[in-house]
Amino acid sequence: MEWDSDSEGSGDEEEEEEEEEEEGVEVGGGGDGGVGVGVGGGFALAIEGVLGACGLVVSDALEPDFPIIYVNRGFEDATGYRAEEVLGRNCRFLQCRGPFAKRRHPLVDTTVVTDIRRCLEEGTVFQGDLLNFRKDGSPFMAKLQLTPIYGDDETITHYMGMQFFNDSNVDLGPLSVSTTKEIVRSTLITPDNTIRPSPMGKGFCSEHSDLFLLSDEVLCQKILSRLSPRDIASVNSVCKRLYHLTRNDDLWRMVCQNAWGSEATQVLETVAGTRSLAWGRLARELTTLEAVTWRKLTVGGAVEPSRCNFSACAAGNRVVLFGGEGVNMQPMNDTFVLDLNASKPEWRHINVRSAPPGRWGHTLSCLNGSRLVLFGGCGRQGLLNDVFMLDLDAQQPTWREIPGLAPPVPRSWHSSCTLDGTKLVVSGGCADSGVLLSDTYLLDVTMERPVWREIPASWTPPCRLGHSLSVYDGRKILMFGGLAKSGPLRLRSNDVFTLDLSENKPCWRCITGSGMPGASNPAGVGPPPRLDHVAVSLPGGRILIFGGSVAGLHSASKLYLLDPTEEKPTWRILNVPGRPPRFAWGHSTCVVGGTKAIVLGGQTGEEWTLTELHELSLMFPTLNQKDLELYSWKL
């Protein structure tokens, strides 16, 4: 938080302040726990001044950049700014002359600004005389005191600023405003407080609304950032002002974060090239899916010995492979990593400590960043229900067993996903003697003594294996497909079920299912029943389905899209250019950064060629800066 400042203190001023001490009050740090008010002191203020032209500003010290959360009427009257124009902004805008200026005025004393910053960093009181500017550009001197406000835990939670205003005799000349922004503001305010555009405002906002009285910052941070990407794309065609505002990349990042969640945007930022990619372009391509295409890649290294039925997942931009079924059904326990950020990606065997027992038919999931979690599968001694964690970025990567209490029964070919970067969710699978399961368990691996918790539900989907679990909309889970029990039979399924774990009593809901009594099928052509397919969670909640085992086919290549957040979910088919893989299985495909799916290998008989990859990319290759400047939103 920075305030306009101009330090011109002198001995005469000190004498004047001493004379005022006898009849004034001082607002200062009142010791532990908050603000105190005392009589006298070096910053004495006349009682008449307190009751008169006193500006009061409160800023939130716990938020980045100390945003203003309150201003009083005295501040509004003295500065010409209305509360809605300044809330959410940093106080440094008072250093700029006029509402559209972007830089501190050269007459502002930077040494005083530095002193203010020092006081804020140290949590001490600041007192001084500052040069500020009204909304109309006229200067005034303000006697200012900034006082920290403490919470119950001795943490500074807010800063209170008290200002007393005096006109300044500085001759600054007329206020210059850029032509574009002058036209934006060239409106006449009618008696009923609405806006009537003037003739020179032709082509700009002509709505009779107080909305356009708001500053650009308030419009972006409080209104536009809360819209969906599609809504922002529509808003930018309303007028030139909104068009220019919606070309701001910082606004697009806020829009994406609000629409997709902070976790999704953080994952996107870890992907190579995303930081140099315009968020507006990213929002468009992940919303319209116009850039989806297949690419075939060849990488170096090798995964030896050869195997199948392994499990793979992505940690950032790295693909991690663990275990699998070797020759003669030999369970394997080695770990391989493929770094897609490398100039020449190649498979690399990782020497890890305390490797888990070998297995196949297990699940490997990424919790967050570089931490992986492994569960279940079939080992040398039979089915497993153990949990192991691995931190890829540790100096010496080590598989660490998580001894969870009350674990689910051992299983393989189950499905799992992670929540909040801390919790593992496990559902279904195959138990001893080929019994199919329908239970759902949750484990918080960050607890000192983790305890498995079965999700209670009055009704559960039919028992199944080879299905998929996808997280969307925060803490909601979507289950699709699998080999499900139907009476005495086991049939491939294309059922869709959802579970909201944020509810007090979570319950499964059937969205669609050909085998469910009374279940309604959504509009559009749905995917054929399948198991061991690929499910890709897209930012915004949509789910992409392809591949797997389909009756009469080895692996279906069509892509199906479903948005479970819609009032009436509708299946859509995506026509994707490029050459798709011949095979795509859920256990050997992983989603990297929310922008691409990597399908590992081709298959000839029982041999896997893991140096051949197929990438389903959701974005166009990165454009140069000139192309980015020309890139525009039109949905």
UniProtKB/Swiss-Prot annotation:
Subcellular location per the Swiss-Prot or TrEMBL entry: Nucleus
Sequence ranges assigned to domain F-box in this UniProt record: 209-255
CDD domains to which the protein is assigned, alphabetical: F-box_AtADO-like, PAS
Keyword line: Biological rhythms, Chromophore, Flavoprotein, FMN, Kelch repeat, Nucleus, Photoreceptor protein, Receptor, Repeat, Sensory transduction, Ubl conjugation pathway
Domain PAS residues, every copy: 44-123
InterPro entries, sorted: F-box-like_dom_sf (IPR036047), F-box_dom (IPR001810), Gal_Oxase/kelch_b-propeller (IPR011043), Kelch-typ_b-propeller (IPR015915), Kelch_2 (IPR011498), PAS (IPR000014), PAS-like_dom_sf (IPR035965)
Pathway the protein acts in: Protein modification; protein ubiquitination
Entry PTM: FMN binds covalently to cysteine after exposure to blue light and is reversed in the dark.
Biased composition (Acidic residues): 1-25
Kelch repeats: 371-421, 423-474, 476-530, 542-594
A GO molecular function held by the record: photoreceptor activity
Modified residues (S-4a-FMN cysteine): C91
Any one cellular-component term (Gene Ontology): cytosol
Keyword Nucleus listed: yes
One GO term of the biological process aspect: circadian rhythm
Function: Component of an E3 ubiquitin ligase complex that plays a central role in blue light-dependent circadian cycles. Acts as a blue light photoreceptor, due to the presence of FMN, that mediates light-regulated protein degradation of critical clock components by targeting them to the proteasome complex.
Record-given protein name: Putative adagio-like protein 2
